[in-house]
């Protein structure tokens, strides 16, 4: 039952990552299309669940953004409730992590309400984006932990009694085919974590620039250009961090080979982000699709980097955990040869 339930929650967490990335992108599209106040009330839109007569592109974006947020909230509630009710069959970290994500979803909903009722204040909109990106990373980590083969607490005693591997802190043991004899290089999780922090900071800086409408003001009136310059300056270390991680992973043997598909994807996303960022500036933000694609790339990049960081630390934890004690070797017995007297006297 435990493994089946865990596989179901793993699938649910994967769908939640996709839904959260879509939520970030739709929220960005809502801002780009200036549709943040297309629905003047909250949580309904024009007093109904589906505003048929008022429906246009802007209303649809805001309405669909709220619908996606509602779906994410329901999915997170199912994950957290199942983790608590079935905690004896699941890893002990899952109720805490899923509960924290559920609290963040509730906080995110409150921020969404404030963005409408307070008429889009920049600080609230930025906090709304920051919470969404944090949720993307946390749920991505949750999915990786579930995928890694976390075993229920009840399975710990049989594993120990049968001479199996003892479970390190956090309720994890290397599962079959998990490459338990290989581990991440010591530098790998640190570099992945640094790249994640740099990209997260760059994404927040981009969100601050967007909520201040700094790029538009810089192009039209020559004001607010400091935000634009800061965003361009911070893009360099973020891009170099991801590309360095991808290059070192490509040339490193062992465990790193399994991470090459994701690190290569992250590197391609960074290259695409550079192209989209340059294009949006050259087009002076006149093509909404380019800006929205830029936000999609940032959300996907954060989800992948969070997953890679989790994999790195998890691999280190699994191989550095307490090792099972082997049984002492039997003491060889000394066989004494019979003395001549014993031979004579029988």
Regions found by a protein language model. Give the residues of each.
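Polytopic transmembrane helical bundles with strong interfacial aromatic enrichment
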Residues: 1-161, 166-168, 172, 177-346
């Amino acid at each position: 039952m435990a493994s089946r339930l865990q596989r179901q929650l793993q699938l649910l967490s994967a769908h939640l990552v996709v839904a959260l990335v879509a939520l970030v992108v739709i929220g960005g599209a809502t801002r780009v299309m200036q549709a943040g106040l297309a629905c003047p009330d909250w949580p309904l839109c024009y007093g109904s669940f589906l505003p048929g007569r008022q429906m246009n592109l802007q209303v649809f974006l805001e309405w669909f953004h709220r619908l996606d947020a509602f779906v994410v909230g329901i999915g997170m509630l199912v994950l957290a409730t199942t983790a608590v009710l079935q905690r004896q069959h699941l890893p002990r970290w899952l109720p805490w992590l899923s509960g924290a994500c559920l609290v963040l979803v509730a906080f995110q909903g409150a921020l969404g309400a404030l963005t409408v009722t307070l008429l889009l204040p920049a600080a609230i909109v930025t906090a709304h984006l920051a919470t969404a990106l944090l949720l993307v990373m946390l749920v991505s980590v949750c999915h990786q932990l579930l995928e890694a083969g976390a075993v229920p607490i009840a399975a710990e005693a049989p594993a120990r009694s049968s001479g199996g591997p003892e479970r390190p802190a956090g309720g994890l043991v290397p599962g079959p085919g998990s490459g338990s004899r290989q581990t991440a290089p010591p530098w790998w999780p640190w570099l992945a974590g640094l790249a994640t922090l740099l990209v997260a900071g760059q994404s927040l800086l981009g969100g601050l620039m967007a909520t201040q409408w700094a790029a538009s003001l810089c192009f039209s009136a020559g004001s607010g250009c400091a935000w634009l310059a800061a965003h361009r300056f911070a893009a360099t270390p973020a891009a170099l961090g991801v590309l360095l991680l991808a290059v070192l992973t490509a040339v490193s043997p062992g465990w790193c080979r399994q991470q090459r598909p994701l690190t290569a994807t992250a590197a391609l996303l960074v290259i695409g982000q550079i192209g989209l960022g340059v294009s949006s500036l050259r087009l002076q933000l006149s093509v909404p699709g380019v800006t929205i694609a830029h936000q999609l790339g940032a959300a996907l990049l954060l989800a992948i980097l969070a997953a890679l960081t989790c994999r790195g630390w998890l691999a280190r934890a699994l191989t550095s955990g307490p090792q099972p004690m082997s049984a002492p070797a039997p003491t060889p017995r000394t066989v004494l040869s019979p003395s001549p007297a014993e031979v004579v006297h029988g």
